[in-house]
Regions:
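Extended, polar beta-sheet/loop recognition surfaces of beta-rich domains
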Residues: 308
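Alpha-helical transmembrane segments of multi-pass small-molecule/ion transporters
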Residues: 1-305
Length: 308
Protein backbone atom coordinates (compact mmCIF):
# COMPACT_ATOMS: atom_id res chain seq x y z
CA UNK A 1 0.00 0.00 0.00
CA UNK A 2 2.81 2.41 0.91
CA UNK A 3 4.62 1.96 -2.40
CA UNK A 4 1.38 2.27 -4.36
CA UNK A 5 0.51 5.50 -2.54
CA UNK A 6 4.08 6.80 -2.81
CA UNK A 7 4.34 6.31 -6.56
CA UNK A 8 0.82 7.67 -7.16
CA UNK A 9 1.71 10.87 -5.28
CA UNK A 10 5.23 11.21 -6.71
CA UNK A 11 3.96 13.43 -9.58
CA UNK A 12 2.51 15.79 -6.95
CA UNK A 13 5.95 16.26 -5.40
CA UNK A 14 7.33 16.64 -8.93
CA UNK A 15 5.03 19.59 -9.58
CA UNK A 16 6.10 21.26 -6.33
CA UNK A 17 9.75 20.69 -7.29
CA UNK A 18 9.18 22.28 -10.72
CA UNK A 19 7.70 25.34 -9.02
CA UNK A 20 10.54 25.43 -6.47
CA UNK A 21 13.27 25.31 -9.12
CA UNK A 22 11.43 27.91 -11.21
CA UNK A 23 11.32 30.21 -8.20
CA UNK A 24 14.95 29.66 -7.23
CA UNK A 25 16.18 30.50 -10.73
CA UNK A 26 13.80 33.48 -11.10
CA UNK A 27 11.89 31.86 -13.95
CA UNK A 28 8.69 32.42 -11.96
CA UNK A 29 8.04 34.69 -8.98
CA UNK A 30 5.40 35.44 -6.33
CA UNK A 31 3.30 37.41 -8.81
CA UNK A 32 3.18 34.37 -11.10
CA UNK A 33 2.13 32.15 -8.19
CA UNK A 34 -0.74 34.55 -7.44
CA UNK A 35 -1.92 34.18 -11.05
CA UNK A 36 -1.88 30.37 -10.75
CA UNK A 37 -3.78 30.46 -7.45
CA UNK A 38 -6.26 33.05 -8.70
CA UNK A 39 -7.00 30.77 -11.65
CA UNK A 40 -7.71 27.91 -9.22
CA UNK A 41 -9.88 30.03 -6.94
CA UNK A 42 -11.96 31.94 -9.47
CA UNK A 43 -12.32 29.46 -12.34
CA UNK A 44 -11.45 25.92 -11.28
CA UNK A 45 -13.31 25.89 -7.92
CA UNK A 46 -16.72 26.80 -9.47
CA UNK A 47 -16.11 24.25 -12.24
CA UNK A 48 -15.40 21.55 -9.65
CA UNK A 49 -18.86 22.27 -8.25
CA UNK A 50 -20.37 21.35 -11.63
CA UNK A 51 -18.34 18.14 -11.83
CA UNK A 52 -18.69 16.90 -8.25
CA UNK A 53 -22.00 18.18 -6.88
CA UNK A 54 -23.83 17.83 -10.19
CA UNK A 55 -22.98 14.11 -10.37
CA UNK A 56 -23.19 13.23 -6.69
CA UNK A 57 -25.00 10.07 -5.51
CA UNK A 58 -27.10 11.67 -2.78
CA UNK A 59 -29.17 8.54 -2.12
CA UNK A 60 -26.22 6.89 -0.33
CA UNK A 61 -25.35 9.78 2.02
CA UNK A 62 -24.61 8.79 5.61
CA UNK A 63 -25.48 12.04 7.37
CA UNK A 64 -24.64 10.69 10.85
CA UNK A 65 -21.10 9.86 9.79
CA UNK A 66 -20.69 13.22 8.07
CA UNK A 67 -21.93 15.03 11.20
CA UNK A 68 -19.16 13.43 13.29
CA UNK A 69 -16.60 14.43 10.66
CA UNK A 70 -17.97 18.00 10.54
CA UNK A 71 -17.88 18.17 14.35
CA UNK A 72 -14.20 17.19 14.33
CA UNK A 73 -13.46 19.58 11.45
CA UNK A 74 -15.10 22.44 13.37
CA UNK A 75 -13.03 21.67 16.49
CA UNK A 76 -9.79 21.70 14.48
CA UNK A 77 -10.83 24.89 12.67
CA UNK A 78 -11.49 26.60 16.01
CA UNK A 79 -8.20 25.34 17.49
CA UNK A 80 -6.20 26.52 14.46
CA UNK A 81 -7.89 29.92 14.47
CA UNK A 82 -7.50 30.37 18.24
CA UNK A 83 -3.83 29.33 18.36
CA UNK A 84 -2.98 31.72 15.51
CA UNK A 85 -5.00 34.59 16.99
CA UNK A 86 -4.32 34.24 20.72
CA UNK A 87 -0.88 32.62 20.97
CA UNK A 88 0.81 33.93 17.80
CA UNK A 89 -1.08 37.26 17.75
CA UNK A 90 -1.85 36.99 14.03
CA UNK A 91 -4.43 39.16 12.26
CA UNK A 92 -8.01 37.96 11.90
CA UNK A 93 -7.68 37.10 8.21
CA UNK A 94 -4.47 35.10 8.70
CA UNK A 95 -6.04 33.26 11.64
CA UNK A 96 -8.94 32.25 9.39
CA UNK A 97 -6.46 30.88 6.83
CA UNK A 98 -4.66 28.90 9.56
CA UNK A 99 -8.01 27.48 10.70
CA UNK A 100 -8.98 26.59 7.12
CA UNK A 101 -5.65 24.96 6.36
CA UNK A 102 -5.66 22.93 9.58
CA UNK A 103 -9.16 21.56 9.03
CA UNK A 104 -9.58 21.09 5.24
CA UNK A 105 -8.14 17.92 3.73
CA UNK A 106 -6.79 17.23 0.27
CA UNK A 107 -9.54 14.65 -0.23
CA UNK A 108 -10.14 15.31 -3.91
CA UNK A 109 -6.63 14.66 -5.26
CA UNK A 110 -5.08 12.52 -2.51
CA UNK A 111 -7.64 10.20 -0.85
CA UNK A 112 -10.39 10.02 -3.48
CA UNK A 113 -8.26 8.51 -6.30
CA UNK A 114 -7.01 5.80 -3.91
CA UNK A 115 -10.51 5.04 -2.66
CA UNK A 116 -11.83 4.60 -6.22
CA UNK A 117 -9.53 1.60 -6.67
CA UNK A 118 -9.56 0.17 -3.14
CA UNK A 119 -13.20 0.52 -2.00
CA UNK A 120 -16.74 -0.08 -3.22
CA UNK A 121 -19.19 2.66 -4.30
CA UNK A 122 -20.90 3.00 -0.89
CA UNK A 123 -17.55 3.40 0.87
CA UNK A 124 -16.62 6.21 -1.51
CA UNK A 125 -19.81 8.22 -0.86
CA UNK A 126 -18.61 9.54 2.56
CA UNK A 127 -15.61 11.08 0.77
CA UNK A 128 -17.88 12.58 -1.90
CA UNK A 129 -20.13 13.95 0.86
CA UNK A 130 -17.20 15.71 2.53
CA UNK A 131 -16.00 17.11 -0.80
CA UNK A 132 -19.48 18.43 -1.65
CA UNK A 133 -20.31 19.98 1.72
CA UNK A 134 -16.86 21.57 1.91
CA UNK A 135 -18.12 23.95 -0.79
CA UNK A 136 -20.35 25.41 1.95
CA UNK A 137 -17.63 25.54 4.63
CA UNK A 138 -15.10 27.04 2.21
CA UNK A 139 -17.75 29.51 1.06
CA UNK A 140 -18.40 30.61 4.66
CA UNK A 141 -14.66 31.02 5.23
CA UNK A 142 -14.45 33.22 2.13
CA UNK A 143 -17.32 35.30 3.56
CA UNK A 144 -15.29 35.75 6.77
CA UNK A 145 -12.21 36.76 4.75
CA UNK A 146 -14.31 39.25 2.82
CA UNK A 147 -15.60 40.66 6.11
CA UNK A 148 -12.04 40.95 7.45
CA UNK A 149 -10.88 42.78 4.31
CA UNK A 150 -13.32 45.67 4.88
CA UNK A 151 -12.27 48.38 7.33
CA UNK A 152 -15.88 49.53 7.61
CA UNK A 153 -18.52 46.82 7.76
CA UNK A 154 -21.14 47.34 5.06
CA UNK A 155 -23.36 44.27 5.08
CA UNK A 156 -25.05 45.22 1.81
CA UNK A 157 -21.72 45.48 0.02
CA UNK A 158 -20.46 42.26 1.61
CA UNK A 159 -23.66 40.44 0.62
CA UNK A 160 -23.32 41.59 -2.99
CA UNK A 161 -19.67 40.54 -3.03
CA UNK A 162 -20.76 36.96 -2.23
CA UNK A 163 -22.34 36.77 -5.67
CA UNK A 164 -18.71 36.39 -6.80
CA UNK A 165 -17.81 33.86 -4.06
CA UNK A 166 -16.26 30.97 -6.08
CA UNK A 167 -17.25 28.21 -3.65
CA UNK A 168 -20.87 29.39 -3.45
CA UNK A 169 -21.01 29.73 -7.26
CA UNK A 170 -19.77 26.14 -7.57
CA UNK A 171 -22.34 24.97 -5.02
CA UNK A 172 -25.16 26.79 -6.85
CA UNK A 173 -24.17 25.46 -10.28
CA UNK A 174 -23.78 21.90 -9.01
CA UNK A 175 -27.12 21.87 -7.16
CA UNK A 176 -28.89 23.43 -10.15
CA UNK A 177 -27.60 20.68 -12.46
CA UNK A 178 -28.54 17.99 -9.94
CA UNK A 179 -32.04 19.14 -8.97
CA UNK A 180 -33.13 19.98 -12.51
CA UNK A 181 -31.39 16.92 -13.95
CA UNK A 182 -29.75 19.06 -16.63
CA UNK A 183 -28.06 17.00 -19.32
CA UNK A 184 -24.60 18.37 -20.05
CA UNK A 185 -23.40 17.80 -23.64
CA UNK A 186 -20.26 15.73 -24.13
CA UNK A 187 -18.30 18.74 -25.41
CA UNK A 188 -19.17 20.75 -22.27
CA UNK A 189 -18.26 17.78 -20.06
CA UNK A 190 -14.87 17.63 -21.71
CA UNK A 191 -14.39 21.36 -21.13
CA UNK A 192 -15.30 20.90 -17.45
CA UNK A 193 -12.82 18.03 -17.12
CA UNK A 194 -10.06 20.02 -18.84
CA UNK A 195 -10.55 22.92 -16.44
CA UNK A 196 -10.73 20.69 -13.34
CA UNK A 197 -7.61 18.76 -14.35
CA UNK A 198 -5.65 22.03 -14.31
CA UNK A 199 -6.34 22.55 -10.60
CA UNK A 200 -3.65 20.31 -9.13
CA UNK A 201 -0.76 21.44 -11.39
CA UNK A 202 -1.56 25.14 -10.88
CA UNK A 203 -1.85 24.87 -7.08
CA UNK A 204 1.25 22.71 -6.59
CA UNK A 205 3.49 24.69 -8.95
CA UNK A 206 2.40 27.86 -7.11
CA UNK A 207 3.20 26.12 -3.80
CA UNK A 208 6.70 25.29 -5.08
CA UNK A 209 7.30 28.88 -6.19
CA UNK A 210 6.31 30.24 -2.77
CA UNK A 211 8.39 27.57 -1.04
CA UNK A 212 11.51 28.88 -2.80
CA UNK A 213 11.33 32.13 -0.78
CA UNK A 214 12.75 32.42 2.73
CA UNK A 215 10.49 33.02 5.71
CA UNK A 216 10.68 33.86 9.42
CA UNK A 217 10.59 31.64 12.52
CA UNK A 218 6.98 32.52 13.33
CA UNK A 219 5.75 31.17 10.00
CA UNK A 220 7.79 27.98 10.47
CA UNK A 221 6.24 27.50 13.93
CA UNK A 222 2.78 28.07 12.47
CA UNK A 223 3.47 25.48 9.76
CA UNK A 224 4.29 22.94 12.48
CA UNK A 225 1.08 23.84 14.32
CA UNK A 226 -0.95 23.29 11.14
CA UNK A 227 0.75 19.94 10.50
CA UNK A 228 0.22 18.79 14.10
CA UNK A 229 -3.47 19.70 13.98
CA UNK A 230 -4.10 18.21 10.53
CA UNK A 231 -2.11 14.97 10.55
CA UNK A 232 -2.22 14.00 14.25
CA UNK A 233 -4.93 15.82 16.24
CA UNK A 234 -7.66 15.67 13.56
CA UNK A 235 -7.65 11.85 13.10
CA UNK A 236 -7.18 11.28 16.86
CA UNK A 237 -10.24 13.37 17.76
CA UNK A 238 -12.21 11.76 14.91
CA UNK A 239 -11.26 8.27 16.13
CA UNK A 240 -12.08 9.16 19.75
CA UNK A 241 -15.56 10.46 18.84
CA UNK A 242 -16.41 7.43 16.68
CA UNK A 243 -15.05 4.97 19.25
CA UNK A 244 -16.88 6.72 22.09
CA UNK A 245 -20.28 6.38 20.39
CA UNK A 246 -19.52 2.77 19.40
CA UNK A 247 -19.57 3.56 15.67
CA UNK A 248 -18.52 0.81 13.24
CA UNK A 249 -14.95 1.78 12.38
CA UNK A 250 -14.98 -0.37 9.25
CA UNK A 251 -17.81 1.75 7.82
CA UNK A 252 -15.95 4.94 8.77
CA UNK A 253 -12.56 3.85 7.39
CA UNK A 254 -12.65 6.14 4.33
CA UNK A 255 -13.78 9.05 6.50
CA UNK A 256 -10.83 8.40 8.81
CA UNK A 257 -8.53 8.41 5.77
CA UNK A 258 -9.84 11.88 4.84
CA UNK A 259 -9.23 13.03 8.42
CA UNK A 260 -5.59 11.88 8.14
CA UNK A 261 -5.05 13.35 4.66
CA UNK A 262 -2.64 16.25 4.02
CA UNK A 263 -3.83 19.84 3.93
CA UNK A 264 -6.06 20.95 1.07
CA UNK A 265 -5.25 23.77 -1.34
CA UNK A 266 -8.12 26.09 -0.43
CA UNK A 267 -6.28 27.82 2.41
CA UNK A 268 -3.37 28.62 0.09
CA UNK A 269 -5.64 29.69 -2.78
CA UNK A 270 -7.71 32.17 -0.80
CA UNK A 271 -4.75 33.39 1.25
CA UNK A 272 -3.20 34.49 -2.04
CA UNK A 273 -6.42 36.06 -3.33
CA UNK A 274 -6.96 38.04 -0.10
CA UNK A 275 -3.27 38.99 0.26
CA UNK A 276 -2.69 36.97 3.43
CA UNK A 277 0.76 35.57 4.26
CA UNK A 278 1.10 32.09 2.72
CA UNK A 279 4.50 31.00 4.13
CA UNK A 280 3.12 28.75 6.89
CA UNK A 281 0.61 27.16 4.53
CA UNK A 282 3.10 26.12 1.84
CA UNK A 283 5.54 24.65 4.36
CA UNK A 284 2.84 22.71 6.18
CA UNK A 285 1.74 21.43 2.78
CA UNK A 286 5.06 19.70 2.11
CA UNK A 287 5.38 18.31 5.65
CA UNK A 288 1.79 17.05 5.76
CA UNK A 289 2.09 15.36 2.35
CA UNK A 290 5.11 13.35 3.53
CA UNK A 291 3.53 12.37 6.86
CA UNK A 292 0.18 11.51 5.22
CA UNK A 293 1.90 8.76 3.21
CA UNK A 294 2.38 6.98 6.54
CA UNK A 295 -0.86 7.96 8.32
CA UNK A 296 -3.18 6.93 5.48
CA UNK A 297 -1.35 3.62 4.99
CA UNK A 298 -1.73 2.86 8.71
CA UNK A 299 -5.46 3.64 8.64
CA UNK A 300 -5.99 1.57 5.49
CA UNK A 301 -4.19 -1.53 6.78
CA UNK A 302 -5.08 -1.40 10.49
CA UNK A 303 -7.85 -3.72 11.71
CA UNK A 304 -10.86 -2.29 13.52
CA UNK A 305 -10.36 -2.38 17.32
CA UNK A 306 -13.80 -3.94 17.68
CA UNK A 307 -12.82 -6.83 15.42
CA UNK A 308 -10.03 -7.92 17.76
Amino acid sequence: MFYSLFFSTLPLFGLVFIGFISGKFDLLNKSDSKVFLKLVGLIIVPTLGIKIIGNFRYEFINWNLYFYYFLTQSIIYFLGFSIAKIIFKRQFSESIIIGMTSSFSNHLFFVYPIALFEFGPKDIVPIETIISVDFITVGLSVCALELASHKKINFGQIFLSQLKNPALIGLFLGLTIFFFQIHIPLSVNRLVNFICDAGTPCALIAMGILLSYQTDKTQIKLSLVITLLKIFIFPLIQFFILYLINYDLNISRTTMMVAAAPIGAMGLVFASIYNVTTDAVVRSGIISYVLALISICLLYTSPSPRDS
